[in-house]
A protein has these predicted regions:
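Vicinal oxygen chelate
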Residues: 1-14, 46, 55, 85, ...
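Core segments of cupin and vicinal oxygen chelate
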Residues: 13-16, 22-65, 92, 99
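Short, solvent-exposed beta-strand edge segments and adjacent coil->beta transition regions
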Residues: 15-20, 78-82, 127
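Short hydrophobic-acidic sequence motifs that mark active-site Asp/Glu residues
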Residues: 17, 65-67, 139-141
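Acidic di-acidic motifs
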Residues: 27, 89, 134
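Residue-level recognition of conserved beta-strand positions in structured domain cores
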Residues: 59, 68-70, 144
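Residue-level signature for short turns and capping positions that connect secondary-structure elements
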Residues: 62, 71-73, 147
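Helix-adjacent hinge/juxtasegments
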Residues: 69-93
Length: 156
């Protein structure tokens, strides 16, 4: 880690944003159909020669997109796990996915290290979840966040 002249760690001063996460899939068209069925925006679908194809989709209002295709990664299809999507209401989000034909787990919450059924009784942020997989088994986790604590919101 780099330090300043006093030996303290340097604080990042360059604005960097996570733009894209690449997930491995076995069937590009099947994956594209699945993610579009979630209501995600299609940003790009193009080929580079005959061996590389890239599809980019973005969840509603997300600052980060998801890319998949052929020739993009050596990871095994289905090996991406715990890809987290933040939602304001876990039950509404789960119902929306069910209405779209997605197989979604029941809502569960964390109490200490234990996972229990249903949303967090106090509906505290970061503690209620539901999970689903894409057709290849890449694992997604819905996480309910209603309030971000200080330090988790960027100040300009």
């Amino acid at each position: 880690m780099s330090t300043d002249v006093s030996g303290e760690p340097k604080v990042a001063t360059v604005d960097m944003k996570l733009e894209v996460v690449t997930i491995p899939v076995s069937d590009v068209d099947r994956a594209k159909d699945f993610y579009l069925s979630l209501g995600w925006r299609l940003d790009a679908d193009f080929a580079f020669g005959k061996d590389v194809r890239a599809v980019q989709v973005t969840p509603l209002h997300s600052g980060c997109s998801v890319t998949f295709g052929s020739g993009l990664t050596t990871a095994e299809p289905g090996s991406a796990q715990r890809l987290e999507l933040v939602v304001e209401d876990i039950e509404v989000a789960r119902d929306d996915l069910l209405d779209r034909g997605v197989k979604v787990s029941e809502v569960f919450h964390r109490d200490g290290g234990e996972l229990l059924p249903g949303p967090d009784p106090e509906r505290r942020s970061y503690l209620s979840y539901a999970s689903f997989n894409d057709p290849d088994g890449n694992g997604w986790l819905l996480q309910e966040v209603t309030t971000r604590p200080p330090g988790r919101v960027w100040e300009d």
